[in-house]
Amino acid sequence: MNDMNSGFVNDLNMILATDFYQLTMGAAYYQYNLENNITEENDIATFELFIRKFPENRNYLIFAGLEQAIQYLLNARFTERTIKFLREKEVFKKIDPSFFDEYLPNFKFNLDVWTMREGNFFFPNEPILRVQGPMFHAQIVETYLLNVINFQSLIASKASRIKNIAPNKVLLEFGTRRSHSPLAGVYAARASYIAGFNGSSNVVADLELGINSSGTMAHSFVQKFDDELDSFDLYYKIYGKNSIFLIDTYDTEKGAQKSCKYGNTIWGVRIDSGDLIDHAKKVRKILDDNGCEKVLIVASSDLNEYKIKEIIDKNAPIDVFGVGTELATSRDDPTIAGVYKLIEYNGEPKIKISEEKVTYPGIKQVHRIYDRNGMFKEDILSLAYEPAPSNSETLLIPIMKDGELITKLPKLDDIQKFYLDNIKKLPKTYKKLEEVDIFELKISEKLRHLTDSLKLKYT
């Protein structure tokens, strides 16, 4: 008998893909409302999700993960198994049985949601997602929303830096084997694709998301045969013009020479080790001297935006970059400071105050201003009821009402197209690889006054 358990998150248990304190708080809210005859209509909370600060050397961020967040809000339910699990927790022994018998079995998220468009660029302290609804509903979604949005926004922002450096190269995401879980590998492929990558090695991302899966061969495929050329022959026999030969198993230049047997009838050759700049120049000469001018050179091997910039600056003839570990883990700074904070309860603005952290209170809106050339100029954070500044773009738009989708989610290709068009509006200074410290979020006078008055009230 197989008693193993995968531990995978699925449609039947994803409601519990959260921190336990979300559920203890939620149950306490329920008990309080029950004892005080408070209905959910009179227990309305508003939260905003935003990033506190840039990861290292970032000057902008890319919003990604919205579709997975919305899927959760539409589909997550408490099942008999999850309810039984919670009921048996000793910590809940003082919670009224109706919580488990009536409330959870019939639970469905009843939330209003506003959001930036997925693929948009944004900056710290700007709400990218706003959630409003009964306190229990709005509270317990925090962990899941942060998980999918933090990670995908982190990877999309990293991929965007790489795309900025190599806008005319083919970019492939190769990081699944080094990502932090199978699901993280899929999400990394998705986030990279949003930020302009052309494909991924991840096959599930192809099956489920339509991101073209691509790959070459491993060194083991070459090593299986006594003669390197035999491995090329077999691969070519099966895959023909789609063949990409890995030529660095033994000797890169000799491998390149052997690949010339097939002329321009193969797609490319890949180099995965050594001095990529030197190897690429020598391989290109070998290919060209043997009439293989159309054969492309693919490079991998712990690539990142800095290494790719050096390769391009030194005119190495590499056509395709496969970027793995550095991208799928955002290795230079693998975290993003995303938070989800209560900013209003039953119409009353709320604020979080500490020595280092202040959360702007009240329901807010982000307005984007462009210059006369259509380039990004500044963002203004204001209270949502304030009139929009003239000639501004309002970034937070309604997407869910009363728990139902009211704005159709775009297809992944359309998200990528929006990103590619929109990122052109961001001045080049923001796209530098080093931190430039030029962004300053403009705060409206009414929001600043509200913030100051609440700080005075609570300190």
What positions do the PLM features span?
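Ordered alpha/beta subdomains of enzyme catalytic regions
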Residues: 2-239, 253, 340-459
